[in-house]
């Protein structure tokens, strides 16, 4: 299950970072 969790995290991370950068601007 760890492998699938890492894959999901890798997919979610860019969008979370994108939202964070948008809020900082």
Curated annotation (Swiss-Prot):
What is the superkingdom listed in this entry's lineage?
Answer: Eukaryota
User: A single Gene Ontology molecular function, please?
Assistant: toxin activity
Q: Where in the cell is it found?
A: Secreted; Target cell membrane
Instruction: Tell me one Pfam family matched here.
Output: Antimicrobial_4
Return the GO cellular component terms, semicolon-separated. Answer: extracellular region; membrane; other organism cell membrane
Q: Where is this chain primarily localised?
A: secreted
Gene Ontology biological process terms from the UniProt entry: defense response to bacterium; defense response to fungus; killing of cells of another organism
Claim: RNA-binding is one of the keywords in the record: no
Q: Which InterPro entries match?
A: Antimicrobial_4
Record's keyword terms, sorted:
Antibiotic, Antimicrobial, Cytolysis, Fungicide, Hemolysis, Membrane, Secreted, Target cell membrane, Target membrane, Toxin
Which tissues is it found in, per the record?
Expressed by the venom gland.
**What does the sequence similarity comment in the record state about its family?**
Belongs to the non-disulfide-bridged peptide (NDBP) superfamily. Medium-length antimicrobial peptide (group 3) family. Ponericin-W subfamily.
The protein's job, in short, is: Has a broad spectrum of activity against both Gram-positive and Gram-negative bacteria and S.cerevisiae. Has insecticidal and hemolytic activities. May act by disrupting the integrity of the bacterial cell membrane.
Q: What is this protein called?
A: M-poneritoxin-Ng1a
Per the UniProt record, the source organism is Neoponera goeldii
